[in-house]
């Protein structure tokens, strides 16, 4: 048996799971919050519903990793560090260089560092997390699992922007797409649930959380996705605007006196359903306000759902049909209201969903279509950490790869 750590390092957080491979048994799941503060919070769940948490000063990610590994031994989850065979790290961006996960060496670290301009908020903490584990577990293989890798199969007609071609060749300006690890997991799982080879399926994956993206997956390969050069492109999100007329940036600079960076900050952090509703970036709050008659909340829900509705139609056309629509992530898995708004009116393309199955369906695998529906509709809770663990085993040749 092989124990793998799946890690997602944020600017002030460290999420992790410890999995036994190849059985894929979850041994522990944890979160360190407020890294860099005197009152950092460490929480871990393990065993049969057991939980441990502590508030303690943690000034660096290295200290957070040290505490994590110490607690794994203290709580008898592992007996020694030697039991950890590999560490898989979620990394935001792999550009065109990485179409698959990769064992991390000095060259890979330099390359990831060079991607910082494309992910200034995410890449530095990704690197910090890697360095912290390398320092404490120097002989354990570390694997980078890129959010963008799954979308490297997109054809040119879907990843190129209609800009001078040299912007692509000289500066790498193109659609990259994100949430690839999630889209990969749910589409593979959909094939298992449908009992059909992934190679034969045309799937539309809707990853709907505070960040949100749709992917068209044909034959197990991403052929199009809504996020672009950055995660700002695409559908309306919690605080991100999604796609809009780029001429708005100089217009708003002129009208508001803001810099380009300030306007982009508004589009990333003050827009989306938060900016539209003036209430919250959390769709649960907006659903409640809409139910109470708040007009801006209702319009926000309509815009959010309508954009997704439109992309489903576009991607069905691109793939010459669709076999299943998948809902995943916080909103996709848990909001029957949003799912209903998105699915309503898709009967013309063979989507017949059952309101009695949709209503109240939360956080569990479930088909919510009528049996006769040509297009299946499936809720699949995402499991990015499992993909990270599988890739770590496969790429580092730790045990026979997961089938």
UniProtKB/Swiss-Prot annotation:
Which residues does the annotation list for site: Transition state stabilizer?
A: 179, 240
Q: Which UniProt keywords apply?
A: ATP-binding, Cytoplasm, Kinase, Magnesium, Metal-binding, Nucleotide-binding, Transferase
- Cofactor(s) annotated in UniProt: Mg(2+); Mn(2+)
Q: Which GO terms describe its biological process?
A: acetate metabolic process; acetyl-CoA biosynthetic process
Q: Where does substrate bind?
A: 90
Note how many cofactor molecules are bound and how: Mg(2+). Can also accept Mn(2+).
Keyword hit for DNA repair: no
| Pathway involvement of the protein, from the record | Metabolic intermediate biosynthesis; acetyl-CoA biosynthesis; acetyl-CoA from acetate: step 1/2
Q: What is its main location?
A: cytoplasm
Q: What class does this enzyme belong to in the EC scheme?
A: transferase
Q: How does it assemble?
A: Homodimer.
* Annotated family: Belongs to the acetokinase family.
Q: What name does this protein carry?
A: Acetate kinase
Native organism:
Exiguobacterium sp. (strain ATCC BAA-1283 / AT1b)
């Amino acid at each position: 048996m092989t124990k793998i750590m799946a890690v997602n390092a944020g600017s002030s957080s460290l999420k992790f799971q410890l999995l036994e491979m190849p059985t894929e048994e979850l041994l522990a799941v944890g979160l360190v919050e407020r890294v860099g503060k005197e009152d950092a919070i460490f929480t871990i769940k393990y065993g049969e519903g057991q939980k441990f948490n502590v508030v303690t000063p943690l000034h660096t990610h290295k200290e957070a990793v040290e505490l994590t590994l110490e607690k794994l031994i203290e709580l008898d989850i592992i007996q020694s560090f030697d039991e950890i065979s590999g560490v898989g790290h979620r990394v935001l961006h792999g550009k065109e260089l990485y179409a698959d996960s990769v064992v991390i060496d000095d060259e890979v670290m330099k390359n990831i560092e060079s991607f910082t301009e494309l992910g200034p908020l995410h890449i530095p903490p990704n690197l910090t997390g890697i360095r912290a584990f390398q320092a404490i577990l120097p002989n354990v293989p570390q694997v980078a699992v890129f959010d963008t890798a799954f979308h490297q199969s997109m054809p040119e007609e879907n990843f190129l922007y209609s800009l001078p071609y040299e912007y692509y060749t000289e500066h790498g300006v193109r659609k990259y797409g994100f949430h690839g690890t999630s889209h990969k997991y749910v589409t593979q799982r959909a094939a298992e649930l449908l009992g059909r080879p992934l190679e034969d399926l045309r799937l539309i994956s809707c990853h709907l959380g505070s960040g949100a993206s749709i992917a068209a997956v044909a034959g197990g390969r991403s052929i199009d996705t809504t996020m672009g050069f950055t995660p700002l492109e695409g559908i309306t999100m919690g605080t991100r605007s999604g796609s809009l007329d780029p001429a708005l940036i100089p217009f708003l600079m002129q009208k508001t006196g803001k810099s380009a960076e300030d306007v982009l900050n508004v589009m990333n952090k003050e827009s989306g359903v938060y900016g539209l509703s003036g209430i919250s970036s959390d769709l649960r709050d907006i659903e409640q306000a809409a139910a109470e008659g708040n007009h801006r909340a209702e319009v926000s829900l309509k815009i959010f759902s309508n954009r997704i509705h439109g992309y489903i139609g576009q991607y069905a056309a691109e793939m010459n049909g669709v076999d299943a629509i998948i809902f995943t992530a916080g909103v996709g898995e848990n909001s029957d209201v949003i799912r209903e708004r998105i699915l309503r009116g898709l009967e013309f393309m063979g989507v017949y969903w059952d309101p009695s199955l949709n209503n109240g369906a939360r956080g569990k695998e479930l088909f919510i279509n009528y049996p006769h529906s040509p297009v299946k509709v499936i809720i699949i809770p995402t499991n990015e950490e499992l993909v990270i663990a599988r890739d770590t085993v496969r790429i580092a040749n730790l045990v026979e790869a997961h089938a």
